[in-house]
């Protein structure tokens, strides 16, 4: 008879210890990287996807990327000139809020900017995302791409999906085995939040409505202890004060 496996029970003290160790590792990792690399960048992420972030990490293996508790990262850099870990680096800490991270690298700024400007990935939207466009599926036979491409380049939606799209809100019927939309159907509207029903339909029709991209907010250069804010960085005006 096989031995029964007892489930591990983590005590509150163990959980708190692991949390403290994680924060300490992040804190020291940020400070050590600031000492070791020529540049530190602050970046934000739109439509976070771990798959694409992993690809970025792989592309920048000689560098270090941190994404974690922003308060810990800010504390590691220092909030004021008196407590900053390196001269002038505290000027960047006001940018550390939201979905942001740190990139430590020896690569020149032009190389970093060029890489991230070109690294844009289209993906399926998740519930809560804002629709970047308006799309209406036209009445009549429903095609697999829902009007995204010319019908002569498309194929009819398989009849087995009719119950599913109808359940998701599309007014459809089967006519001679063809999924048919009884009226124009507004799938999404630009500027409005998407719900789970809409995101499921978008994915079913192969329509990507999310864009993963990394925005560079500013960087610190060890040479000359200089700080540069990118024009698009939110909060840069406040940080420069």
UniProtKB/Swiss-Prot annotation:
GO cellular component: cytoplasm; nucleolus; nucleus; preribosome; preribosome, large subunit precursor
Subcellular location as annotated: Nucleus, Nucleolus; Cytoplasm
CDD domains: Ribosomal_P0_like
UniProt keyword terms in alphabetical order: Cytoplasm, Nucleus, Ribosome biogenesis
Oligomer status and interactors: Associates with the pre-60S ribosomal particle.
Family, per entry: Belongs to the universal ribosomal protein uL10 family.
Function: Component of the ribosome assembly machinery. Nuclear paralog of the ribosomal protein P0, it binds pre-60S subunits at an early stage of assembly in the nucleolus, and is replaced by P0 in cytoplasmic pre-60S subunits and mature 80S ribosomes.
PANTHER family: MRNA TURNOVER PROTEIN 4 HOMOLOG (PTHR45841:SF1), MRNA TURNOVER PROTEIN 4 MRTO4 (PTHR45841)
Protein name: Ribosome assembly factor mrt4
Origin organism lineage: Eukaryota, Fungi, Dikarya, Ascomycota, Taphrinomycotina
Gene: mrt4
